[in-house]
Regions:
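N-terminal amphipathic alpha-helix/helix-capping segment at the start of soluble metabolic enzymes
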Residues: 1-22
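Short amphipathic alpha-helices and their capping/turn segments at secondary-structure boundaries
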Residues: 8-11, 35-50, 154, 158
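Acidic (Asp/Glu)-rich catalytic clusters
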Residues: 13-17, 43-50, 86-88, 107-112, ...
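Structural preference for beta-strand elements that scaffold enzyme active sites
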Residues: 19-23, 52-56, 92-94, 114-116, ...
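Short histidine/acidic/glycine/proline-rich micro-motifs that form metal-
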Residues: 28-29, 176
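Glycine-rich anion/phosphate-binding loops
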Residues: 29-44, 73-80
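N-terminal active-site wall of soluble small-molecule enzyme domains
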Residues: 57-118, 126-129
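Conserved anion-binding
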Residues: 62-65, 112-115, 119-176
Length: 176
């Protein structure tokens, strides 16, 4: 696995070819207006500096510390908002998935929208989730858990690749 580079395009963003790109947006979708305002503002800045941009927002933040915390609008409304943003801005979108069932439901709800399914850090070792995401045929970003040694992330990536996905990447972060 070391030294092997796979590249692909998601919308106007090239991944794996050494080109810097930006993933940015609100942690969670609070409203369509708020998400669209942020998408437009970030898109202007990214365009001004010549950096390709993916809009990131989650329809559900399932790992909140408190059960009373706002989690988002849910999959159906969240997918509608992500679709509206993608269609209104031309941006590809990235959003978290938390269960194997959500992978297929979200993929169907977004239809032809350019989307990256992101596996949250806390779930980066969950085999069933990685396989389900791979089976959608969508691009996948596996976020590295802080509890995972950098070299151990190859196992998550291989689970995705061995399950039919050719469009995968990983986000790195600090290790404990």
């Amino acid at each position: 696995m070391a030294g092997v580079t796979h590249s692909f395009d998601i919308g106007n963003v090239s991944v794996g070819r050494g080109q810097l790109f930006l993933i940015a947006g609100p942690c969670v979708i609070e409203s369509e207006t708020h998400a669209r305002t942020l998408a437009d503002a970030i898109q202007r800045v990214a365009s001004d500096v010549g950096i390709p941009y993916l809009f990131k927002a989650s329809y559900d933040k399932a790992n909140r510390t408190s059960i009373r915390s706002f989690r988002g609008p849910g999959l159906v409304e969240g997918a509608r908002i992500l679709r509206a943003i993608a269609q209104g801005t031309g941006l590809p979108v990235l959003t978290d998935v938390h269960t194997p069932e959500d992978c297929l439901r979200l993929s169907k709800a977004l239809g032809d929208v350019e989307v990256v399914l992101q596996i949250p850090a806390f779930l980066c070792r969950q085999t069933d989730l990685l396989i389900a995401a791979a089976h959608t045929g969508r691009a996948i970003n596996v976020k590295k858990g802080q509890f995972v040694a950098p070299l151990d992330m190859q196992h998550a990536v291989l689970k995705v690749r061995d399950s039919a996905a050719t469009l995968s990447t990983q986000s790195r972060r600090a290790s404990s």
